[in-house]
């Protein structure tokens, strides 16, 4: 099928390959990298783009601009945006002859990797492990050891899957379940219903799941409650808690980190309550017995340290707990109730050359089982998801991610080092595109690493960039300088909420309790699971000398098929502002208490007070009015509630940390509240989170006074 040509007012502004189209085959010998892998030479031959992935995903659009169209990067992207935003991601193949030389020294460029456990990135698996860990912590506090594995009718079962199945057919608050309910539960678990399987399933529920869920249900705290230490009487009933007077709470002695002592009114009460809980949840028979539903194998302790001083083994805050000699660990209520937060561990230091050899050896050894078969993109993708799903196999890989070009230098030529190289000022050079004409990021006061200054990424086979949207819902452009295929998955921006609902359905505990989970860049979800839940997913295979563009609010993720070197940066054409992505991105981050990287108000103010060729007055006016009216409304509200000193504070912007609200993390560009007792500040909406000092010590700092804001309303 031939490429489709789209027309607007000018001839053929874009060439576009449909999802059913294929790219032209690569020249002979260009499907894999050459043998001289340690050299600076690159294989930039065009590779064949698959028409479908192993998941049956359709390929996203691929564009082939001619030399004239390719002259203006932002202009060209603006033209194809109406098509690209329907897919979330697209690929752009430069015209023949465009091939900037990579500037990195393979033997001198050094970096540190991140370690990635393929299992732990998978959202479903992490939900299972998180539940298992929380149950384990609960029973640790009771001095009880858990079996390492559980069985029903010789079928291995994890407590999380059994809990979810019970919860879908009954209530976890019910201690005794009807026989017909157990029949449905076992049927859903594909376990034959017998008297033995009924007893084994019921025993697992009563021994492990019900006690833990009952504890969580009774002592679950709201999201807004603050856990300062575990000395708070978490084991009190509501009535018992109400009997402690305010005076008692204030005068009771607190934990002293120097002496490691915690005494006072709460200590004896909590110790008694711990003993009550042990009696309440301790079964009459031996918990670690070698019965028919579990192995009598001690569960590996999650910490090698002992806990003679009763500090939480996870957060290291004090915890009062009667811990038996058989189990030295103890955990505070917060670390039992809430899922732990997952993150990548740091890996080793490498040069590019050394890492390439390491990656090539790994890939060669791993795929040696395929003997003489060609290692295609399909094979690598299948193996990746097989490894993620296989509970009996654990594989760790390494990834050189988020390597700032401010520190290491870009792989593109730069004007500073290569002033006569034409690629140094090319609009597709990632050092240029963020601040080129047409990108609103040129109106940001200071460079932002990873946003206006590119980052480098060095991949190995199976290394992963997890599902995420770009900071502040901006566009991104990713260029591959060298190496093996980088597989991309993308979702249209208008399906972001559908994606979030799918994630909630897959892992409700994690998503509910970690509001910013999908913004942590540490979560993978199989495209099959997303498609089952009505999410449209597209894919692209990226090779050397190819660009991938992601669109605002588009969740995307991907897998490296081997050693490769990529570079990425963000940019923001005017439609990013005019279509509401700038403001909505800031509001979304504020709701998650997640720090943004850009200030929407600063951008709008700078555009309004400086001539901007990128955007007209009529286009900008609604956004100026929105920002000004919102700020004036906040000032009216604050002045009505509090009697604060006010000063004009023009230096507000010099240090980003000093104008970021310490509660909601949003940039408070026009005004902020400070106190003489500390250096931190908050936005006017969150003055109550600043400190407990008298209002006379607090000041409302204004970067822009009311009169100047009022003048902007006539913009």
Swiss-Prot record:
InterPro entries hit by this protein: ARID_dom, ARID_dom_sf, JmjC_dom, JmjN, Znf_C5HC2
BP term (GO), one: chromatin remodeling
GO cellular component: chromatin; nucleus
PROSITE patterns cross-referenced by the UniProt entry: ARID, JMJC, JMJN
Sequence ranges assigned to domain JmjN in this UniProt record: 60-101
Key word Iron present: yes
Keywords: Iron, Metal-binding
Region (Disordered): 21-53, 247-271
Source organism, top-level taxon: Eukaryota
Official protein name in the record: Jumonji/ARID domain-containing protein 2
Species for this entry: Schizosaccharomyces pombe (strain 972 / ATCC 24843) (Fission yeast)
Name of the gene this protein is made from: jmj2
